[in-house]
Amino acid sequence: PFGQYKVSDRQYDKHNFLIHDYFFAKTLDKVRPGGIVAFVTSKGTMDKKNPEVRKYLAQRAELLGAVRLPNTAFKENAGTEVTSDILFLKKRDRVMDIEPDWVHLTEKDGIVMNQYFADHPEMVLGKMEMVSGAHGMESACLPDTSLPLSAQLKNALSHVEGSIEQADFNEIDDEL
């Protein structure tokens, strides 16, 4: 869900999240400690000026890795040209007062972007450039055509760190 509107939910109203940020926060809060969540989102989550949703997520989860997709990644099946990110988060066992580098923005080659992608260019599947968008000039990840996107994605995903922890579940009685 995307849009410039908010969801009314007493538990989250104080955060003033837009709808997509609200769903990220609520989803993460529903995951068990140690659970892993993968979000596909626009670059706005990682690159927008307001860091509040990134702070919220960082206090509750470790960023295992993030991949910036080129703006053509969804063109064939969805008809859109939008720079997107895949975020991999592992829920912490408690909320921590922490603000890692990926909460912040930096400028690289004249383009404002998330510190994580500046520090990890191997996770950017293309080249960040300023392009003319619907609301003026904006940053976009233009595709690297030297390799198929699938090969680039496979390589980037090999850099995502973390481990899967076995969860204990209560067995369901077959006689229900």
Give the location of each predicted region:
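Conserved ATPase-coupling elements of RecA-like P-loop NTPase cores
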Residues: 3-10, 49-50
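Conserved Class I SAM-dependent methyltransferase catalytic core
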Residues: 14-75, 82-89
